[in-house]
Amino acid sequence: MSPVATESMYKPTTINQTAHQQAMDPLKSKQQSNATVNKPAFKPEPAVNLTPIKFAPIKEHQVQRAMVRRYFQDMEERAISDVIIVGAGSAGLSCAYALGTARPDLKITILESNVAPGGGCWLGGQLMSAMVCRKPADEFLDQVGVPYEDEGNFVVVKHAALFTSTVLSKVLAMPNVKMFNATACEDLIIKPCPINPGVQRIAGCVTNWTLVSLNHDHQSCMDPSTITAPLVCSFAGHDGPFGAFCVKRVASAGLSEGLGDMRPLDMERAEDHIANKTREILPGLIVGGMELSEFDGSARMGPTFGAMLLSGKRAAEVALQSLDRVKIEEGEVVGLAK
């Protein structure tokens, strides 16, 4: 029996209905449009006076060997480091810059769990671009060579990425600095302190590729690697899968009274605390940046970066004093310096 014709069967198709049909069946709509629409052919203007580009010949195995050789040479060389910096955000990079500039003889190794270093310093607050730094952090920007606009008590870098890319490029250009990104610190090396009996000392980092660290629940027997160092400077931040990792680990190991947990936002109190309280919380472990707020229970500062920069710089100063006090053999503290 034939269906009864209704008025709706004879209504013309609207533009909205056509768009809906195309969304439901894009392949069919594309075939129909190709059959009914005559598109004008695009004729690009011919390129004039452009020199042909011809790359030098290469074999795939050459690329592989060039990458593998350098990466594992770096791993072998940095199996013993002078300083490990955990976290390549604004505080960690500032520490690396200050430390590498002051002591080009030190082997500084940076561990960054993300593929892209920089932490939260590619943008300002709420995904906006400007970077606000309260004075006197402008002095550090001058040292690094980052331009800014002076607003009186604070300065503004036009885009946070300008600071991050500038300090990152200068840090990575230092011959004494090596960075392993996409590499997580998933534990700490902790040994009895040879200086203070009964006290434990941080003696390096346990590392793994981040994708492996994040998948231990899915596959067993993925053992890590290690880097030995007399000093670890941790700037692991306060969020993300590895946020505040080192202070959480020493708390779980029973080496601290626990975490203070970060308090709500108060810019003035927060920045003063973070910049001035950056310190060696345990023998061999200096903590700064937002990780320190999780340890001390201080306020968060929000989208102002001055304390991050000066916390990193302060950590470098503390690190140099700490290293000068101890005698080191094969990356391990064996006693006090004479």
Swiss-Prot record:
Which residues of this UniProt protein bind substrate?
A: 91, 112-113, 120, 185, 223, 238, 290, 300-302
Q: Mind telling me how this protein is modified after translation?
A: During the catalytic reaction, a sulfide is transferred from Cys-221 to a reaction intermediate, generating a dehydroalanine residue.
Record keywords: NAD included?
Answer: yes
**Gene Ontology cellular-component terms listed:** cytosol; nucleus
Question: Where in or outside the cell is it found?
Answer: Cytoplasm; Nucleus
What family is reported? Belongs to the THI4 family.
Top-level taxon of the source organism: Eukaryota
**Free-text cofactor note:** Binds 1 Fe cation per subunit.
Q: Which residues, renumbered to this chain, carry the PTM 2,3-didehydroalanine (Cys)?
A: 221
Q: Which UniProt keywords apply?
A: Cytoplasm, Iron, Metal-binding, NAD, Nucleus, Thiamine biosynthesis, Transferase
Where along the chain is composition biased (Polar residues)? 11-21
**What cofactors does this protein use?**
Fe cation
NCBIfam families for this protein: sulfide-dependent adenosine diphosphate thiazole synthase
UniProt GO molecular function: cysteine-dependent adenosine diphosphate thiazole synthase activity; iron ion binding
PANTHER family attached to this UniProt entry = THIAMINE THIAZOLE SYNTHASE
This one is known as Thiamine thiazole synthase
